[in-house]
Protein backbone atom coordinates (compact mmCIF):
# COMPACT_ATOMS: atom_id res chain seq x y z
CA UNK A 1 0.00 0.00 0.00
CA UNK A 2 1.17 3.57 -0.44
CA UNK A 3 2.29 6.17 2.06
CA UNK A 4 -1.06 7.97 2.08
CA UNK A 5 -3.18 8.36 5.20
CA UNK A 6 -5.51 5.54 6.25
CA UNK A 7 -7.88 4.44 9.00
CA UNK A 8 -7.14 0.87 10.10
CA UNK A 9 -9.67 -1.05 12.20
CA UNK A 10 -8.48 -4.12 14.08
CA UNK A 11 -10.60 -6.77 15.78
CA UNK A 12 -8.95 -6.44 19.21
CA UNK A 13 -6.21 -3.81 18.84
CA UNK A 14 -8.48 -0.85 18.12
CA UNK A 15 -8.63 1.87 15.48
CA UNK A 16 -5.59 3.68 14.07
CA UNK A 17 -5.03 6.78 11.95
CA UNK A 18 -1.87 5.96 10.03
CA UNK A 19 0.46 7.06 7.29
CA UNK A 20 2.10 4.24 5.41
CA UNK A 21 0.98 0.63 5.65
CA UNK A 22 2.94 -2.46 4.76
CA UNK A 23 0.75 -5.56 4.56
CA UNK A 24 2.49 -8.77 5.55
CA UNK A 25 -0.53 -11.05 5.12
CA UNK A 26 -4.33 -10.85 5.08
CA UNK A 27 -4.72 -9.72 8.70
CA UNK A 28 -1.29 -8.38 9.68
CA UNK A 29 0.16 -4.97 8.86
CA UNK A 30 3.08 -2.74 9.80
CA UNK A 31 1.98 0.85 10.43
CA UNK A 32 4.92 3.18 9.76
CA UNK A 33 3.45 6.13 11.72
CA UNK A 34 0.18 5.93 13.62
CA UNK A 35 -2.07 7.41 16.27
CA UNK A 36 -4.62 5.24 18.05
CA UNK A 37 -8.12 6.70 17.85
CA UNK A 38 -9.47 5.56 21.20
CA UNK A 39 -12.85 7.25 20.87
CA UNK A 40 -14.58 9.91 18.81
CA UNK A 41 -17.61 12.14 18.49
CA UNK A 42 -19.10 13.81 15.45
CA UNK A 43 -18.99 10.80 13.13
CA UNK A 44 -21.45 7.94 12.97
CA UNK A 45 -18.98 5.34 11.70
CA UNK A 46 -15.40 4.95 10.50
CA UNK A 47 -16.57 5.57 6.94
CA UNK A 48 -17.48 9.10 8.06
CA UNK A 49 -14.28 9.52 10.10
CA UNK A 50 -12.17 8.86 6.98
CA UNK A 51 -14.16 11.48 5.03
CA UNK A 52 -14.76 14.28 7.58
CA UNK A 53 -12.59 13.53 10.62
CA UNK A 54 -13.98 13.92 14.16
CA UNK A 55 -15.37 16.73 16.30
CA UNK A 56 -14.07 15.40 19.59
CA UNK A 57 -12.56 12.29 21.01
CA UNK A 58 -9.36 10.71 22.21
CA UNK A 59 -6.48 10.43 19.76
CA UNK A 60 -3.28 9.08 21.33
CA UNK A 61 0.31 10.23 20.79
CA UNK A 62 2.02 9.24 17.52
CA UNK A 63 4.05 6.03 17.38
CA UNK A 64 6.72 5.24 14.80
CA UNK A 65 6.39 1.60 13.80
CA UNK A 66 3.55 -0.57 15.07
CA UNK A 67 2.62 -4.12 14.08
CA UNK A 68 -1.04 -5.07 14.24
CA UNK A 69 -2.08 -8.68 13.73
CA UNK A 70 -5.87 -8.45 13.64
CA UNK A 71 -6.70 -6.06 10.78
CA UNK A 72 -10.29 -6.30 9.57
CA UNK A 73 -10.79 -3.01 7.67
CA UNK A 74 -8.60 -0.40 5.94
CA UNK A 75 -10.11 2.87 4.71
CA UNK A 76 -8.36 5.64 2.74
CA UNK A 77 -8.65 9.13 4.26
CA UNK A 78 -9.77 12.19 2.33
CA UNK A 79 -7.85 15.45 2.67
CA UNK A 80 -10.38 17.04 5.07
CA UNK A 81 -10.14 14.06 7.42
CA UNK A 82 -6.33 14.06 7.27
CA UNK A 83 -6.14 17.74 8.25
CA UNK A 84 -8.67 17.20 11.03
CA UNK A 85 -7.00 14.12 12.50
CA UNK A 86 -3.47 15.53 12.27
CA UNK A 87 -4.64 18.52 14.32
CA UNK A 88 -6.37 16.58 17.10
CA UNK A 89 -4.77 17.16 20.51
CA UNK A 90 -2.74 14.27 21.91
CA UNK A 91 -4.73 12.36 24.52
CA UNK A 92 -2.48 11.66 27.49
CA UNK A 93 -3.02 11.09 31.22
Give the ranges of each region predicted by the language model.
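Conserved RNA-binding domains used in RNP assembly and mRNA/RNA metabolism
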Residues: 2-93
Amino acid sequence: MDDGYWIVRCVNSGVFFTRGIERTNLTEAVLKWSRMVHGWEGAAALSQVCVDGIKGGRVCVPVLGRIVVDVCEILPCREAAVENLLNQPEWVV
